[in-house]
Amino acid sequence: MREFNVADGEDWHANNAETSLMLAVAPELVRPQVARQADDPDRTAELVFSHPVNRTSTNGVTGTPSIASAAQGQRAFEWMVDDLCALIERGLRETPPLDHSYFSPVAP
């Protein structure tokens, strides 16, 4: 999933991944005619600090939203759901590192 997220930019604001995801889950919020002409190169790779998008992009986009598709977004959404479910399942099986009651003193 990470590779898809940042394939065209370390900052994935309005890049292929984010635009694809929006095309899959809320297409009415995407302006395809704008996205097709909005590609802007990533200027955030290897930066130490995060900067506001108006300091990293000429038009609010990072990467290549022009290649976005609902199909890519649907796959990304499924990956995200699978990852979240796996994390929840792992959390449900997890036990504390030390077997102490929440109400007992810290030291045994």
Regions found by a protein language model. Name each.
Residues 1-108:
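Extended, histidine- and acidic-residue-enriched regions that form the cofactor-binding/catalytic faces
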